């Protein structure tokens, strides 16, 4: 039995699809390289190009610029399309979560300028940008977020973890030190008494994980709260999963 010619069995993309895919690739490459002038040139030729990419592409242009840390490109995109900053990627992370996790402090500042409420935005597992900064040990980002949104210090995840819990769980001593210092200076002693889902305070976690420096830091501050003297319950679960990479 004769088979039809191969050419007839292949579905070729239309010229419109090819053009869209090409423009997507060009824009994403510009985002990776931070080529703002090239972006402006494309916009002069097609003022709707950013909207077209947002509608037709599964990837987010701003995410690409965020991950590579191109501040000028991020500034230009947020200036042109401020509503982009509230969009989530396919994994459920906001742009602020990604910037905080990667330690891009200038981008974090820029996003705060666009919308200060992004500091308290909850993502997967109710984690805020401060939670991700603590997990990754991004000290500069922690300082910026606390300065812009002090109430974030008491925000808890679905497992009732504060940023301090997460810093200790992930062995981020510098982040822990910065958080403890901020808590002390801002009279937020109650944070030391907050227990997670397993009823562990940060002191419980530090003792269980044998983090001597953290234990000494907490005891030296004398701000560990009465709940820290309850029996230790070493039932810490993993917490580094589901973090923007």
Predicted segment positions?
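Start-of-repeat signature of ankyrin repeats
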Residues: 23, 57-58, 92, 126, ...
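Internal amphipathic alpha-helical repeat/solenoid segments
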Residues: 6, 12, 16-21, 36-92
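Conserved ankyrin/ankyrin-like repeat signature
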Residues: 38, 72-73, 106-107, 140-141, ...
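Membrane-proximal ectodomain caps of single-pass cell-surface receptors
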Residues: 151, 158-164, 169-245
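Ankyrin-repeat boundary/linker signal
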Residues: 53-55, 88, 121-122, 155-156, ...
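Ankyrin repeat domain, specifically the short helix-to-loop turn at the C-terminus of the second helix
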Residues: 43-48, 76-83, 109-118, 143-152, ...
């Amino acid at each position: 039995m004769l088979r039809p010619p191969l050419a007839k069995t292949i579905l070729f993309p239309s010229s419109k699809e090819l053009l869209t895919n090409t423009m997507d690739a060009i824009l994403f490459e510009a985002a990776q390289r931070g080529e703002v002038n090239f972006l402006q040139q494309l916009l002069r030729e097609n003022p709707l190009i950013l909207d077209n990419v947002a509608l037709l592409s599964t990837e987010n242009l701003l995410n690409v610029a965020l991950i590579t840390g191109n501040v000028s490109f991020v500034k230009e995109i947020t200036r042109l399309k401020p509503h982009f900053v509230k969009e989530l990627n396919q994994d459920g992370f906001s742009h602020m979560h990604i910037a905080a996790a990667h330690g891009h402090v200038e981008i974090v500042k820029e996003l705060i300028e666009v919308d200060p409420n992004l500091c308290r935005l909850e993502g997967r597992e109710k984690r805020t940008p401060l939670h991700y900064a603590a997990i990754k040990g991004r000290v500069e980002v922690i300082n910026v977020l606390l300065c812009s949104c002090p109430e974030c210090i008491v925000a808890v995840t679905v497992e009732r973890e504060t940023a301090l819990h997460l810093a200790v769980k992930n062995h981020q001593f510098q982040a822990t030190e910065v958080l403890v210092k901020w808590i002390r200076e801002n009279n937020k002693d109650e944070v030391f008494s907050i227990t997670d889902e397993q009823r562990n305070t940060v002191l419980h976690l530090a003792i269980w994980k044998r983090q001597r420096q953290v234990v000494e830091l907490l005891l030296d501050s004398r701000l560990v709260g009465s709940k820290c003297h309850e029996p230790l319950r070493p039932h810490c679960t993993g917490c580094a999963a589901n973090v923007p990479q």
